[in-house]
Amino acid sequence: MTATTVVMLLLMGCGGGFLAGLLGVGGGMVLVPFLVMLFDHAGHDPAMVVQTALATALATIMFTSLSSMRAHHRKGAVQWNLVWLLAPGILVGGQLGSRIVAWLPGQVLAVAFALFVGWMGSRMLRGARRVEPDVPARLPGRLGLAAVGTGIGVLSALFGAGGGFVTVPFLNSRGVPLPKAIATSAACGFPIAFSGTLGYMVMGWWQGLPGGALAYLDLRALFTVVPMSMLFAPVGAY
């Protein structure tokens, strides 16, 4: 990698980590477009560029989410009961999503990613729902939350995201105050990223990617981004 590429990855790590702490989104949405351009310029197989970018972005979230989760936990904002109820579905969904990605053409994934970002951006522009402090949250039961977790896991693996773009609006729409929704989403980031990354490694193991890659993961990009993302995630959380 050139010095310019390293600097850009470090900056993306700073931005992704800050957003992970601030919004509970994991930073993947910021990283994926840049990584696609980076891997394409580096001469990666065009058929696997998008998959490699998605997998690498998702792997960074494993580390970033731990840093962000710790900061939110210290503030007492994480709703751990919801995390445990969402986690089983998330783990299943991450495996399903990574397997879907392995069979989809890169161009289809790129278009789907752009549409998803546009849709979620429009939802964020509408603003958070105002929640009255005395009104209890209206959440589905155990099976309902497991189903929601599965959907979050699938979408996160498909789009290389930490799930915050889905988890935060869902929890907030059901009556969870925004700070607690963000903190809970940050805690869900680790099972999301772990399951999705594991799935990408299994599906990409025999793809013959270039040196510096482990299955679909580009290790050089991963370990350049991670230190800064972990450093800046607590900054966003506070």
Provide a role label for each language-model segment.
Residues T60:
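N-terminal cofactor/phosphate-binding cores enriched in small/glycine residues
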Residues M1-L23, V30-Q51, S65-F159, V168-K180, ...:
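Juxtamembrane transmembrane-helix boundary motif
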Residues A57, T184-C188:
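Hydrophobic alpha-helical segments of secondary membrane carriers
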Residues G27, F194-G199:
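Hydrophobic alpha-helical transmembrane segments that constitute the membrane-spanning cores
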